[in-house]
Amino acid sequence: MRFLTSGESHGPQLTVIIEGVPANLKITAEDINEEMFKRQGGYGRGRRMKIEKDGVEIVSGVRNGYTLGSPVTIVVTNDDFTHWRNIMGVAPISEEEQEQMKRTISKPRPGHADLIGGIKYNHRDLRNVLERSSARETAARVAVGAVCKILLKQLGINVLSRVVEIGGIKDDTDYDLDTIKKHEDSNDVRVVNEDIAQEIRAKIDQAKKDGDSLGGVVQVIVKNMPVGIGSYVHYDRKLDGRIAQGVVGINAFKGVSFGEGFKAAEKPGSQIQDPILYNDEEGYTRASNHLGGLEGGMSNGMPIVVNGVMKPIPTLYKPLASVDIETKEPFKATIERSDSCAVPAASIVCEHAVAFEITKTLLEEFQSNYMEQLQQQVDERRLRNIEF
């Protein structure tokens, strides 16, 4: 399975083509839209999300509610394009017209792709960089992940997420999975503890007032994975390696860990390795899950626990020092419409990025021309964990 997205932040639409979806997967636009709606929420979002209504249109690869096995194409319309039609249109315009629009950007934002992208692609107008490097593209990736979550759910695999920290305020209690599932969308900062949610909202409000932004940590959990997905044989087939690439490939994500993550460096091996148990109903299992469901680059049947670190958004309403690339004189960085905190929304994006990497690796592990074939092989692998 693979996908390709296209489109700019203020262009007419985002398009994604997904190749490798098995035939006979039941899917509708409404199923995908449920996930798209979650991405638009979250405390601290900017005005853009009041404009967009991210409903998708499936334009290929699905007939009468079922996938065909051919590439699935999904379109997400950018409603805000109506305000940017001349600026972001494909037809050429004169330099005078462009100057009158006053949307040319020459003062790059620290922490963003503006300056480096301009150097790399020789763009004097840095809008040509920020339009594609914008996190708006993650809407297309959530659409991909939504398709993957539908497929995984049919196989009995569930993916959920939560926020564990924003701006240094933590809700990192090791809750049981049922509690996390019950509360994952119960409030607009996506933490379990409502008292902590109130503290976080106040911190976000203060950051907005100060013209600043906040980052945080999100957690994704994958339940009921069959064992042995991934590989210990080659580095590029290790499941944790693939998930890590998928997570840090999300805009503003700067780190990833699994299970107890970096805390493992503080403890002896006897407190980090997970003792192996066996029972007739489940087969091989573990007494704990410090390693986050991954051993030797493969799933071990325990919940896969992924932690992602998101830096604060680089667009600031009290901008940092920058340089005008035309005059080389010092200036404050360009201000673009942005969020004060996008960590709750980013937890949804991270959830869907992980869902894609899990699905991609599953489809490589088993023959997957059609769903019935895939389901049979997943069932056989689960049985093997008992009979081995």
From Swiss-Prot:
Residue numbers binding FMN: R132, S133, S134, N251, A252, G296, K311, P312, I313, P314, T315, R337
Pathway the protein acts in: Metabolic intermediate biosynthesis; chorismate biosynthesis; chorismate from D-erythrose 4-phosphate and phosphoenolpyruvate: step 7/7
Keywords: Amino-acid biosynthesis, Aromatic amino acid biosynthesis, FAD, Flavoprotein, FMN, Lyase, NADP
GO molecular function, one term: chorismate synthase activity
E.C. number(s) listed in UniProt: 4.2.3.5
Cofactor note: Reduced FMN (FMNH(2)).
UniProt cofactor(s): FMNH2
Entry binding sites for NADP(+): R39, R45
Amino-acid biosynthesis keyword on record: yes
Catalytic activity reported: 5-O-(1-carboxyvinyl)-3-phosphoshikimate = chorismate + phosphate
InterPro entries hit by this protein: Chorismate_synth, Chorismate_synth_AroC_sf, Chorismate_synthase_CS
GO cellular component: cytosol
Keyword Calcium in record: no
Annotated Pfam families: Chorismate_synt
GO biological process, one term: aromatic amino acid family biosynthetic process
UniProt cross-references to Gene3D superfamilies, sorted A to Z: Chorismate synthase AroC (3.60.150.10)
First-tier enzyme category under EC: lyase
Family: Belongs to the chorismate synthase family.
Function, as annotated: This reaction introduces a second double bond into the aromatic ring system.
Assembly behavior: Homotetramer.
Record-given protein name: Chorismate synthase
Source organism of the structure: Staphylococcus carnosus (strain TM300)
